[in-house]
Amino acid sequence: MLGHNIYEEDDAFNPFADSVSPLNPPKTDQEPSAEGVEEESPNVQASPPKTHIYTSPRKRSVNLKSLPFETLTLDSAPLGPLQFSDAPSMAPENNRLEVGLNTKINPLKGSSPALNADFSANKPWISEVNSFSPSPIGATENPTIPNSEQTVDTLDAASSSAPNFTHTVSSASSQKQGSTSLTDTENQKAHPAAAPQSLTPFYIQVHDPHTVKEITKSHTVYSVSTRLEEHNQPSVSNVTVQRRYNDFAFLYQLLSNNHPGCIIPPIPEKQVVGRFDDEFIEQRRAALEVMLRKISAHPVLRDDYSFKLFLEAETFDPRMTHRTTLIESSSSPLRSGPSTSGLLDSFTSAFHTSGSSKFSEQDPILIEAKDTLDSLETQLKSVYHALLLSIDQRIQFASAIHDFGEAVGNLSLVDLEPTLSSKFDGLSQLQVELRFVQERKVAQDNLTLGTTLEEYIRYVESAKNAFTTRQKLWQTWQSSVQAVSRAKTQLEKCKKQAKSQQKSLPYLEEQYEKYRAKAADLEKEFSESTTLLKRDLSSLTTSRVDDLKASVETWLESAIESQKEIIERWESFLDQ
């Protein structure tokens, strides 16, 4: 720890004790018990954190190749220590959902075998914290749809008004039937959920990036190597495929559509200027590798068909990977029989107007989580903006030191007293050394705090995207409920007609049952997406805050070491 290796005289030193921010809340006298902390009263409104207006500056590119990396003293990097060691795994001890930033973190380190040397390409393996080791949350009962006439009345009544969500996201049908549903607190006490086991990531490596030049435009291709022993193959074998950046972006979009409410590990941002620089390509390669490993560690995403196809297929064609999801299948009318003179046109069109239903979040846990994400994103961007300004000023300071050293060196060449000329020459050499110290500090800031903040911001944006996909699923569900209501109206109207005019009755009954089953499936999937979103939010809070704390400590240690080195060099110069 920082306090042990630098401030040995004060064991209780804490560099973050006096700072109060969303990332470091003030401590309380009482420690949370192992049984969990009682939920706060919903009537008590916490004051929102102070926000700042953020304007994105131009990110300065630092040529890391010109810096003497052999002198870097980083103990860790934002993506993990640069080493040929094992990947750590997370086993959080939280026993309930904690969306806020005051989650207690105590990860347990694990290990996994090293990568196969066949495709290591003599590059260090970048370890990363498994941000998707899910924390247990209270069990939530999925409402059931009984196949009775009561369900028809329920869906008909639900079409006129949106369902009122409770903590357990109970559906409109279960509320209208008067079925008992547990709140979050009661449900957690009645059905305590067992902690899911932490999943080991697949052995994935992104390596050998090379630029493919074309007539119109060029792009970079990456080799993705995977060991198939995690896929229950009879024998261990390595599969290497070629993927470009657009393939990774398309994989992210597929996973987002296939799993509403799931927080997908974010993809690095697109860049137009300097995208073929060696430094930028290496940073993107490392970020893409971490993205794939975190997807493989997610208990839901690792078994996705599109993800397996991305790792194993020779070509990643959108036409091959496209599979109709439940939302897409509900967006088109179910026509399995002949046309019935437009009787179904009045309610099948409801599937194409999913945006007509206005979504209003009623779950207090998700409302608080959404507000926390908005505030957190603003504060993270503010800190990242300030860090970039600090880096820019340090680069200018290093340039000024270099100019001063050259001026003093030229002064030492003048025919002066020999002792004075020697002093000027030593001062000139000292300024050159101090310039390298400042440039090395710039590299350390980028590798530690800068990259971690940027990745954290992308994770927050991915979490907000999970809220959006869940909202689209809710709108599709409400459209299906309206379609069931209209189908029931048409069916009852046909039953009231004369026997000779009821030729379309069997077809209407069949279509009505299909629409009702589809509405039940959408209701169940919406409940599952809510549970998945809460679990991923808890895991995100635990893992990302832990990474940020580690990066801040590493950044502070590097700053102290840089100041010590500067003082030692000045003392050596004075002793000459």
Swiss-Prot record:
What does UniProt give as GO cellular component?
cytoplasm; cytosol; endosome; Golgi apparatus; prospore membrane; retromer complex
Q: Which GO terms describe its biological process?
A: ascospore-type prospore membrane formation; intracellular protein transport; protein retention in Golgi apparatus; retrograde transport, endosome to Golgi; vesicle-mediated transport
- SUPFAM superfamilies membership: PX domain (SSF64268)
Give the GO molecular function terms.
Answer: phosphatidylinositol binding
Subcellular location field: Cytoplasm; Golgi apparatus; Membrane
Give the domain section of the comments.
Answer: The PX domain binds phosphatidylinositol 3-phosphate which is necessary for peripheral membrane localization.
Xref: PANTHER family: FI18122P1, SORTING NEXIN
Q: Which residues form the PX domain?
A: 200-317
The UniProt entry, under Pfam families, shows: PX, Vps5
Name the membrane topology term: Peripheral membrane protein
Q: Which residues carry this modification: Phosphothreonine?
A: 55
The UniProt regions of compositional bias labelled Polar residues, in chain numbering, are 156-169
Q: Which residues carry this modification: Phosphoserine?
A: 332
Gene (UniProt)? vps5
- Specify where the region named Disordered lies, as residue ranges: 1-60, 156-198
UniProt xrefs under InterPro entries: AH/BAR_dom_sf, BAR_Vps5, PX_dom, PX_dom_sf, PX_Vps5, Vps5_C
- Claim: Kinase is one of the keywords in the record: no
Report the superkingdom from the record: Eukaryota
Q: What does the record note on quaternary structure?
A: Component of the retromer complex which consists of vps29, vps26, vps35, vps5 and vps17.
Per UniProt, a 1,2-diacyl-sn-glycero-3-phospho-(1D-myo-inositol-3-phosphate) binds at 244, 270, 284
What is the protein name given in its UniProt record? Vacuolar protein sorting-associated protein vps5
Residue stretches of biased makeup (Low complexity): 170-181
Keyword Protein transport assigned to the entry: answer is yes
